[in-house]
């Protein structure tokens, strides 16, 4: 799953050619309407708004996490309604860090869409550069899409909760948790009903992938992740977080660093804790 970034000025040039589809993924976990409101206030010209909970998640039930993957047939219909297919060139952005854009990136890879880029620095970088802003709302009208090829990629790496439960005792795979250290350790939990982490998990807050709001150089990311993996293969890594969103940022960063093959646990912590029989770990101090 290729990870590619694009600068604000590169996107401005590409957009002028008219051959790119741009999507605004801004969202706030503590205020689900904030992303659309921000989009309506101003956005990159031509961008279409995509909502984490309405477009990039399936129904929440008692046994799922907060942002479960949709059924693939539903996801395919969403992509067709957005006029995205395997021939599309797609650029994604959010407010800056890239966590919501990374979730969309992973889901596009799940559907076999290869040419997808994240705007480095997101909307904040675009605005900081003084580039044009738009206020007109854009949407894709449902219709026939040239080269309509959207299909589930069986090799798109993700695991379910049963896989993790059966592998925990062997410490295989290595679960990398993208939440901030206070949530990972169990010292605080503002979003979920229980605090702590999956036993044996290690912590890498997604913000460590960034420097001054942009992705670190691939060689720096590679060095940092190699230390975290401690001689393990990238294929042994499963990414988790609170609900399968910021985990995608770590997965993207590993791919950007040339460490390919890690997988996503979409349900993450918020799914893990739905069953009281599943063990949890709390780190004191």
Question: What is each residue range found by the language model?
Answer:
Residues 1-285:
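Cytosolic catalytic domains that perform sulfur/thiol-centered chemistry
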